[in-house]
Amino acid sequence: DSLAIDVRFPVANLEALLARLHYVEDHTSQGSLAVVIWTTTPWTLPANQAVAVNPGLDYAVVQVDTDHGQERLLVAKPLLKDSLVRWQIECYRVIACGPGSALEGLMLHHPFYDREVPVILDDHVTTEAGTGAVHIAPAHGQEDYAVGSRYDLKVDNPVGPDGRFLPDTPLFASLHVFAANGRVIDTLKAQGMLLRITRINHSYPHCWRHKTPVIFRTTPQWFISMEQHGLRARALEEIKKVRFTPDWGEARLQDMVAKRPDWCISRQRYWGVPITLFTHKQTGELHPDTLELMEQAAQRIERGGIDAWWELDPIELLGTDAADYVKVKDTLDVWFDSG
């Protein structure tokens, strides 16, 4: 059972939007104009960096009368009737239409922060539910992160490892994300950006061990690049040298290697083989003597076990550089460790 909200993202430049659409003959319209998004995770809105539409869908601007008076709202045409029912709006007029592809680059006002966010295109936007416009928070979802990377969006993660907003987060500092849902909704109401709030029953990921809801948040990790030094190409060539039984195994492995993303080899656990690196406190860059330091760390671990790394005082290896560097506490993916 979750709260679902429809939120206005006001169009920053009305002329820029209307110039991209096809008007209905003899149309008349008035009031503010907003793109409406629908979300079941209000707490992710502080991290919003864009609104995505499907380039292959048709969108409509409708003239409606709401509690805020006359206004114009943009929604995907296949979801128009369902959206109007959800908004409890019976009378409306379609005043303009156009493809989602025409909306790319349009700038919108964030619903409660003083910044503008772009409209971007993403084929993952569907007509299963909502409005056909999806708010994008690259810090809080795999698909959001992927489309955000394509558009070079800022990955702004305002949530700490304890599930609370960071102390410098405007309006929601130190609030737990689930407790912040109510604060976000109140803020949207105060700003006049909340169009509708409903409750829905839907599936949501839970921790298999604790049976509690989980959240998605970006964190710094270590990766092995599939492209640098030609790793993917070399792996594909080596596969050709292997005899497979049955034969179809070769095509399957080739497909897996050809499509796989970079390998995330780091984990945040209290046990496991340590990643013996030191990173600069300010820049995050590796220490310039990293290879030599890894060899020294390996020798210590060979003598004293993996606890030798956890017990190591950085000054023992870095000397005066220790003041500027942090010892990495991540562990290796067990599949990497297995060889």
Residue positions per predicted region:
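Active-site-adjacent "gating/activation" loops or surface patches in catalytic cores
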Residues: F112-I120, K329-G339
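Protease-associated
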Residues: A50, L57-A133, Q142-A146
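Residue patterns forming the tRNA-binding/recognition surfaces of aminoacyl-tRNA synthetases
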Residues: D1-P46, T66-H68, A102-M107, R115, ...
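Generic structural signal for residues in well-ordered beta-strands
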Residues: V119, L194-L195, Y325
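Amphipathic alpha-helical
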Residues: D1, D82-A96, L103, T290-L317, ...
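Conserved phosphate-binding loops in nucleotide/dinucleotide-binding enzymes
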Residues: I136-A139, F178, A323-L332
